[in-house]
Amino acid sequence: MKTLLINCAAALCLLLTGCDAGQAREETIPAPLTGIDHLADHLSVQEFWVNGTSGHQAGGGGSVVCCVKLPQQWHSGLTVVVGWGVTNWRDCTWESHERRVPVERYDEVGSLYVHFLSDGRVRVVSSNISPGYSNEDYAGPHDPIPSKTPYEKYGTWSPRCPVGAKPVLTESLDE
């Protein structure tokens, strides 16, 4: 009886490892995360995240958070889930977004730049070249990155805007 149990346990182990052996594990590398806000002066991306990792506030590209994981090798169909909140300082509103976004082709893993473009698109670029200062070698968008301080132009959020308001859920992967 004891031999039968040992043989059954051994067979079960072989079956379980056999199932896993056919599935190649994707090797990932940590990549610094930066958000770039290309929105109008009265709008700002106050918070964003990629695959659950917070990038905090998007700005001109100088703030870096560690880290998101990217596959060492880019492959067709590679996407990340990007979530973000947009504050409208002029109209006292804010929106919440979540979208699956393709990661643009890369040869080697670099910093992950998330571009929030003025036309509503989001582009995700992994690059070892910074997008700042009109760097022509950067593979991502070259849209203007406005220097802005909406709280100075429109005033602080409180007491001008309602406290405790819920965001308008503009888009969600759950929909």
Each PLM stretch: what is its role?
Residues L33-H42:
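Structural motif
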Residues M1-A9:
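Bacterial N-terminal signal peptides that target proteins for export
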Residues V86-E175:
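Beta-strand-rich cores of mature extracytoplasmic or soluble domains
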Residues Q46-D91:
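Tryptophan-paired
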Residues L15-G18:
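C-terminal motif of bacterial Sec signal peptides marking the signal peptidase cleavage site
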Residues E26, Q73-H75, R105-D107:
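Surface-exposed coil/turn segments at beta-strand junctions on protein surfaces, enriched
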Residues E26-L33:
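Short coil/turn motif common to extracellular beta-sandwich-like domains
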Residues D20-G22:
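Bacterial signal peptide processing site
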